[in-house]
Regions:
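Polytopic alpha-helical membrane-helix bundles and their juxtamembrane interface segments
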Residues: 1-212
Length: 212
């Protein structure tokens, strides 16, 4: 990774630390500035990374952009959870497309990831879906579809065979599952801070994946 990309990732890391602090302290004004800066820094890093595949880079940048929209939507005072989830869903679809674009996916790694995802999700997913069902049919359907797409993202990230993508996919799955748990079941250990930490680490991982 070149100097420019490294500096931008480092700056994104600093913004992330500020964001996590603001979330823990419930400083919404600081969070409103720091949270978008994390993803903006990572978008810049993705654009600066030396990679021979411009299409995959473009898809990752677009996914980061969709995630940025979701972050901003969920921070607004009159935030609509559905709109934020839709933006994140678009980000997942773009990441999935990027993985498929690379070709040569490792079936063995994908199967292993699928088994792990099913095992981990066995306890949490039914409770999240049950909680979403109480919010109405639209929310129930939206959350169910989102969880399925999230699982596919993690599965295909593992199937790339790249360690950075594997870890990033697992972290993104964890982040979104925690978000759903906090929203529809109960406050998860670490609350919103852990959601942010895992989410930001996942996006960093996908940017690093571009260099592999």
């Amino acid at each position: 990774m070149g100097t420019t990309a490294t500096v931008l990732v480092a700056l994104a890391g600093v913004a992330a630390l500020v964001d996590w602090w603001s979330v823990a302290r419930e400083r919404l004004g600081v969070e409103f500035i720091a949270k978008p800066l994390v993803v903006i820094g990572l978008i810049g890093a993705a654009l600066a990374v030396d990679t021979g595949d411009g299409v995959v880079r473009g898809l990752v940048v677009a996914a980061l952009g969709a995630s940025l929209v979701g972050d901003v939507v969920l921070m607004t005072p009159d935030a609509r959870f559905e709109a934020g989830v839709f933006a994140f869903l678009v980000a997942h679809v773009l990441y999935i497309t990027a993985f498929l674009e690379t070709g040569g996916l490792d079936v063995g790694a994908g199967v292993a990831a699928a088994v792990l995802i099913i095992g981990i999700g066995f306890g949490a997913v039914p409770q999240i879906i049950a909680g979403a069902r109480l919010r109405g049919p639209a929310m129930h359907q939206g959350v169910t579809v989102s969880l399925a797409v999230i699982a596919v993202t993690a599965l295909l990230a593992a199937a790339t065979g790249a360690l950075t993508a594997m870890i990033a996919g697992a972290l993104l799955l964890t982040s979104d599952a925690l978000l759903g748990w906090n929203r529809f079941v109960d406050r998860a250990p670490g609350g919103r801070v852990l959601v942010q930490v895992t989410n930001h680490a996942a996006h960093v991982g996908f940017v690093l994946w571009l260099t592999s």
